Regions:
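Membrane-interface helix/loop boundary segments of multi-pass membrane proteins
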Residues: 199-228
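Membrane-helix interface segments
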Residues: 3-7, 139-140, 218-224
Length: 229
């Protein structure tokens, strides 16, 4: 399967799911239902598109991390079911958390994501590499550095906001609050437990589509076009 067909198949899966679920989300909105489960499910579509492309384009002898793929598809199916059921059989809000189906969906992300990651880590190196999922030491280090940079920029932005409003004391009081140091580890743990949501977009857009667009429109043009898409 050539590159053009792969891109078309990727778009077909990704935007096909988006279109169908978008119609259902619109129906739910006009019915006054909570539609928070739909955007969360939508974040999984791009990676699903890549997996379908890899399965369709692979050679007979080529091995892929099928256990990981199957688990991912199961997670996708369950999250889509939760989204659809949220407009058919609304469960109501869980105090302080969100709509019932959204809460169930969150558990699907966590349990399914952890299971998928374990199955991926157990795969042989060459099988993971065939799907672009073999994370090397320097890649993990780079990822941590980027996360630290994001945190630093967020704090700087927050500081500038307080400075412009003349509330520098209030900014300092944020770091004097013990609850901050309790919540930070929780947020980090939650980030890794729910990684599958972010993986869905990064694997689809960054890993698969961005290199194709950069090849055709240049490094900057490809990134800009990806942002538009």
């Amino acid at each position: 399967m050539n590159e053009n067909k792969q891109v078309k198949l990727f778009f077909g899966v990704n935007f096909g799911l988006t279109l169908v679920m978008g119609i259902l989300m619109g129906i739910g909105y006009f019915l006054g239902r909570d539609i928070s489960s739909f955007p969360a499910a939508q974040m999984l579509y791009p990676a699903a598109g890549v997996m379908v492309v890899l399965l369709a384009a692979r050679e007979k002898e080529q091995k892929l991390p099928m256990k990981f793929f199957v688990t991912y598809f199961v997670v996708l199916a369950l999250t889509v079911i939760c989204a659809v059921l949220s407009i058919i059989i609304p469960l109501g809000n869980v105090i302080g958390v969100g709509e019932g189906w959204y809460v169930i969906q969150s558990y699907v992300f966590i349990v399914g994501g952890v299971a998928a990651l374990v199955l991926l880590l157990l795969e042989k190196r060459e099988i993971k590499e065939a799907a672009g999922l073999n994370f090397r030491g320097h890649q993990v280090k780079t990822s941590f550095l980027i996360m630290l940079l994001f945190l630093l920029l967020y704090v700087v932005r927050l500081l500038l906001s307080y400075l412009l409003e003349g509330q520098i004391r209030e900014f300092g009081s944020l770091f004097a609050d013990p609850s901050l140091y309790i919540m930070l580890p929780v947020l980090v743990i939650n980030y890794f437990l729910s990684y599958i949501i972010f993986f869905g977009e990064e694997y689809g857009w960054r890993y698969f589509l961005q290199p194709v667009l950069q090849k055709r429109f240049g490094l900057k043009g490809g990134v800009l076009l990806l942002g538009v898409i």
